[in-house]
Amino acid sequence: AAADAGTILSYWKLRDTVADGPFWKGTAARVLSFLLRPGYRRAAQARPEFDRAVRSCLEELQALEQEGSPSLDRTADTFARILAAAALPAESSARTRALEQLLYHVGRWIYLVDAWDDLEEDGRTGSYNPIAARFPEQVEANRDYLRTTLLHSLNLARSACALLELGHWQGAVENILYLGLPMVEELVFTGRWKAVKKRNSRRTDE
């Protein structure tokens, strides 16, 4: 089930790149999405509701980006709903709701941290950035506000996790929520994240 969700997300992300990206980047994504299509079709048959949710949310997000939406809440919510939709129905509605909330707030956190990380590049290329659209003249002045809303989402994700029994995954998920994500956020907001990614990429290639 997790593999199906990953395949669906990968396929629609590639299709989104085809729609939004420059010619050569779009061409590469078009080829990759073509190669992924058989696996995507099988995954979509296994998880049709998730497939519909991803397609719908990406279309909604694309529309918000094209209109230059200044609303952080609307754009982050649209992305977060994609991850929330990945939650499989559990044995109780309370567990399903907790899992949806965990994924939703992690998704919201990812979207906003990624937007901050992309500020410089998006400004250089003229690409839409929800933070720049919300604070066109005072991005840096709203750093604390953004970190506060990120902490709010992280705390809600942690609260949802506390309601779940995740078996052997419990420790790993808690480690991500309490250590991994805060560390990434600190690296992003201090401008060190890109250097860390580059260094890790070199190690992977060796």
How should these model regions be labeled?
Residues 1-101, 108, 112-149, 155, ...:
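Acidic catalytic motifs of isoprenoid enzymes
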Residues 171-173:
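Membrane-proximal bilayer-interacting regions
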